[in-house]
A protein has these predicted regions:
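Short acidic/polar hinge/loop motifs at secondary-structure boundaries
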Residues: 88-90, 117-146, 166, 192-193
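A beta-strand signature from Gram-negative outer-membrane beta-barrel systems
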Residues: 133-177, 243, 733
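Structural signature of Gram-negative outer-membrane beta-barrels, strongest in the C-terminal barrel
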Residues: 329-331, 339-341, 377-386, 404-406, ...
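Outer membrane beta-barrel strand-and-loop segments of large Gram-negative receptors
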Residues: 441, 453, 461-463, 508, ...
């Protein structure tokens, strides 16, 4: 509801800041006699703390605890997407560059909305959407609500992230920008392979796809079982085999963006407008990595059994985005907007890995060499229409509604992995893959996999608001409904190359997969009675899932005597979900018995209340307290017994039928002080009490990476303190201090879960030799620090920011069999962003990221488990506003 006019008035300097941000500067106006005065206003507020003032006004008017980040703040930090930008928000950490952990709680404990609507996810293993899909260029602001309100989805743990896209401008805008970039890890030649003709656009042209003959067999449910040796060889000859690796120079990073929009007054009552944006970015990142898969303990010493100690990788990403918004406004009281959004993020990675296994090791005089190629396209299409209506004749009653339909696709048309063996034939201690290597002589010398996922989601809802004033009480009643329908289908096919099917295997010597299996070699190959292709698609590789939520809520907002604000209400949700693993060969449910079937279908309905109280200590100071009851439900695949590979960690994950929901009671207390010119300070406390928290546990694995199981702990809690500030440094004196400001936030927190070994065994049906039955939650960091120093020149031509971010160590893999938990180590991110404004139309941006050249590390008991270099990135952007 609208706050009383005398609640938090804008100081004169704040008004100047906002005016400088919003007022257009036409060429004629820029040449007027007041030119110097205008430039002085811009220098005073626009880039120093301008948008901070705007977003602070919104934040302090929220009934519940929330943090908001505006477009200019994102621009100052130089972050390229929503995921990177959100790590600057108090208490938020970024995991795998895609998922946000709010207050130390995993991605399943947060929810994401796009313009207030739920959107589908292209991730086959998670319900939540990867936030790196959303480029910064289309974002107007990011809102993170940390305390639950009944108007939000009840599936709320750490918080709710609402990505607000740019809307129709108040006047004509048209700008173009281009950027070039470079990373220090890309020096020299990098790994590469021959892809398709449309890789530049992030789209496979069919090069990687399974040949039509194999696809026809899969469609007809024949698969590749019991093939004749000649038929298997013929099918294999049609498969792409030219995967290198090659040595090529890396292309520079590049990007292009365009925005155009305008609004038109038809008459005094009607206004029309539009906004269109399009962007394209390509990036190449080479890296050096280390990967320990299987350690062993002998006494007090840890020995390495299966590991890759020399890994080179190259990852290419192509992102493109487009947004079109159309709007109509009548008399400033009725507004309807329609938006269509298309986003694409393609990742193409090749890795060359040298290492040892238990049977193939240096002690045996051999090394192994793996070639991995992973290619995936993630695409999101969304249509949204929303309306906002105010009825002055009905005591200014408000009504808003929205409808959204989204479709997300993950397409991995053809990934490949192959294993070579290198023998030290020359006995010189040097393992040369070109002269001493050969393809592994085994049933699985190479593996091809093909994956698709389609996620469709429809979300619609409405809200009514009715303000009412009586004496010293100002009241607003709000009620509404929210409906979500979601359907997902996923398919996975794979086959192995069986080199035991060749009678004469001398031609397997070499280091290039495509040369070994050249057309000439295959044509002259001698076969035995074993087919060279083995279909390794298994039951559970396919699954279908559906989800439906019907929700209604009521909320009331009371102001009393300009001193107190009471906001509370209740939400009722009816949640239904079903997940069914399928046998690809029969297209029938892959269920062992009726008990399994009943556990895969889940339904619950309940009430979720919340209450918030705000006390206004002064005109610019307030104290908030809130309590809310919420729930966190298992992800779609986590209630299926089938095993799948997490594409982000490469760990196998097994779901658990009968997994229970997590009930959470959330407590928040926050003191806020909003001062002139955007300066502010806030201190908050939070506590979350969880019953049956959903957690990751590790089970013993026979070979390869550890097997991760999803299970319920007994109890859990998270608590901590958050401090946030923004302060101009003019308090230290005149001169340069007038041009500087600092901002930042610190979160210090702790968490604890209690696990019961026997209960986990009963729930998962496997051994659970858990090392620590009481530990922190997976992914929780005990501290998160963000700090920024900003500079703006007196003439408004120069702007610079130094930005620092670090998170405390966090558990990634819980330990078993006496091994301690594995921790991802702190990553000290230090970036510099400099902007030059030679005139009112031009912006030149120079950005340096990861100045400290930090690398990602995962350790346990002072033993390195994984590492990956990141390099230092440089980029130069030119933007022109017409």
């Amino acid at each position: 509801m609208n706050r009383p006019a005398n609640r938090f008035f804008l100081k004169p300097i704040s008004l100047a800041v906002v005016a400088g941000l919003l007022a257009p500067v036409t060429p004629a106006f820029a040449q007027s006699d007041e030119d110097e005065v205008i430039e002085e206003v811009v220098a005073t507020g626009t880039r120093l703390k301008g948008t901070a003032t705007a977003v602070m006004e919104e934040r302090k008017n929220q009934a519940f605890v929330a943090d908001i980040m505006g477009a200019e703040q994102i621009s100052r930090t130089g972050d390229s997407d929503a995921a990177s930008a959100l790590r600057r928000v108090t208490g938020l950490t970024l995991v795998d560059g895609k998922f946000i952990y709010v207050r130390g709680l995993g991605e399943r404990y947060s929810s994401t909305q796009l313009n207030g609507s739920i959107v589908p996810s292209p991730d086959p293993t998670r319900n939540v959407i990867p936030l790196d899909l959303f480029p910064s260029d289309i974002i107007e602001s990011l809102s993170v609500q940390k305390s639950y309100s009944p108007s939000m989805p009840a599936s709320f743990g750490g918080g709710n992230v609402d990505i607000r896209l740019k809307s129709i401008p108040s006047e004509m805008i048209f700008n173009l920008s281009a950027n070039l970039g470079y990373n220090t890890e890309n020096s020299g030649d990098v790994l590469d392979y021959q892809g398709g003709g449309r890789d530049w656009f992030g789209e496979d042209d069919g090069t990687r796809a399974a040949p039509v003959a194999i696809q026809d067999r899969w469609e007809s449910k024949q698969f590749l079982d019991n093939l004749d040796p000649e038929e298997a060889l013929d099918l294999f000859s049609q498969v792409k085999r030219d995967y290198g690796p090659l040595e090529e120079s890396a292309d520079p990073d590049m990007g292009l963006n365009m925005t155009v929009g305008n609004s038109f007054d038809y008459n005094d009552d009607w206004r029309f407008g539009f906004l269109a944006t399009a962007g394209y970015d390509s990036e190449t990142r080479a890296s050096e990595q280390y990967e320990l898969q299987d350690p062993d303990r002998i006494g007090d010493d840890i020995t390495l059994v299966r590991y890759f100690d020399d890994i080179r990788g190259t990852e290419r990403t192509v992102k493109w985005s487009s947004l079109l918004t159309l709007g109509i406004d009548y008399n400033r009281q009725h507004q309807i907007d329609y938006s269509i959004i298309a986003l694409n993020d393609t990742r193409d990675e090749i890795r060359e890995k040298f290492g040892n296994t238990e049977n193939l090791s240096l002690s045996e005089g051999v090394r192994i060499r793996d070639i991995d190629v992973e290619y995936e396209e993630r695409t999101l299409y969304t249509n949204q229409i929303k309306g906002m209506h105010t009825f002055p004749e009905l005591n200014f009653m408000g009504f808003d509604w929205r409808w959204s339909e989204g479709r997300s696709i993950r397409n991995a048309p053809g990934n490949m992995e192959a294993r070579f063996v290198i023998a030290d034939d020359n006995e010189d201690g040097f393992y040369d893959p070109a002269t001493e290597g050969s393809l592994l002589d085994a049933q699985t010398a190479a593996r091809y996999s093909f994956q698709t996922l389609h996620d469709r989601l429809e979300n619609y809802g409405y809200n009514f608001t009715l303000p009412y004033t009586m004496g010293k009480w100002e009241t607003e009643f709000k009620f509404g409904a929210d409906f979500v329908s979601k359907a997902r289908t996923a398919e996975n096919r794979r086959f192995d190359v069986n080199t035991l099917g060749f009678e004469n295997r001398e031609f397997l010597e070499g280091s290039i997969f495509g040369d070994i299996f050249s057309d000439e070699n295959l044509a002259g190959a001698e076969l035995n009675n074993r087919p060279v292709l083995r279909d390794t698609t298994i039951a559970g590789d396919d699954y279908v899932a559906a989800q439906k939520v019907d929700a209604y809520y009521f909320e009331a907002d009371f102001f009393f005597d300009n001193k107190w604000r009471f906001t509370g209400g209740v939400r009722w949700e009816d949640f239904r979900q079903v997940v069914a693993p399928l046998d690809p060969r029969t297209n029938q449910f892959d269920l062992n018995d009726e008990a399994d079937r009943s556990q895969l279908a889940f339904q619950e309905d309940d009430f979720y209340p919340a209450l918030a109280i705000t006390y206004f200590l002064k005109d610019d100071m307030q104290l908030r307290a809130s309590i809310g009851q919420t729930v966190v439900r298992p992800d779609l695949r986590e209630v299926s017994s089938s095993t799948y590979i997490d594409p982000l960690t490469d760990f196998p994950i097994a779901g658990t039928p009968g997994l229970e929901t997590t009930d959470i009671i959330n407590y928040d207390l926050r003191w806020e002080w909003y001062r002139e010119a955007g300066n502010n300070l806030s201190v908050g406390l939070f506590y979350k009490d969880m019953d049956a928290p959903i957690e990751s546990v590790q089970s013993p694995a026979q070979d390869g990476p550890p097997l991760i199981r999803i299970a319920n702990a007994e109890t859990g809690e998270v608590y901590g303190v958050e401090v946030e500030f923004l302060q101009g440094l003019e308090v230290f004196g005149d001169g340069i201090w007038d041009n500087l400001f600092t901002s930042g936030n610190i979160t210090v927190s702790d968490s604890e879960i209690v696990l019961d070994r026997q209960n986990i065994v009963d729930q998962t049906g496997v051994s659970a030799a858990i090392t620590n039955t009481e530990r922190r939650m997976t992914g929780h960091s005990e501290y998160v620090v963000n700090f920024q120093v900003g500079y703006d020149s007196d003439n408004g031509e120069h702007s610079a920011s130094v930005v620092y971010n670090v998170f405390g160590e966090r558990i990634l893999i819980p330990g078993i069999d006496g091994f301690d938990d594995s921790f991802e180590q702190p990553f000290h991110s230090l970036d510099v962003v400099y902007k030059y404004y030679p005139d009112f139309n031009t912006t030149v941006t120079f950005k340096v990221q990861n100045i400290l050249d930090e690398q990602k590390e995962l350790t346990f008991e002072d033993t390195l488990l994984r590492s990956e270099t990141k390099g230092t990135s440089f980029s130069l952007t030119y933007k022109y506003d017409f």
